[in-house]
Amino acid sequence: MFRNVQDILLLGRGFSYAVANETELKIMEASYTNAKAYSSCDYPHGPIATTKRFIPVIFFLTDEKTNDSTIKLVEKIKKDFSVSTLVVTNNEKYITMANEAVLLPKEAEGVAGVFGMAVFSQLFACLLSLARGYNPDEPIGLSKTTVTF
């Protein structure tokens, strides 16, 4: 589903949105694939217009306090745009919502979910890099330090 795509969307809310942002960076760094993270509560207010059938979407669902808006968005995007979807969740009831799913331990809820999603993100970026023929340990142009002006 992801090996030959040029773009990937990542959606989550709360802690999941923070992980989506980090996943965006890891995907771009390791596999040179354009990735963009959005908050699932902000996405319907503009960026949804850029949704394309050929751009797969990864949804992060590991916090029952914030999952509702993301669940509604999964349903809307699948219905209106017929995109390929992957759900990363700790709840079995959500795995059938998407084309593909990664089931984390049920204990990966809220703050604890960040750690499960982070492991997924690292492995996903690494495996995508390898599938595309790149070495994830030698990203082109990566600076390990930031410069402050």
Residue ranges and their predicted role:
Residues 1-149:
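A SIS-like phosphosugar-recognition module
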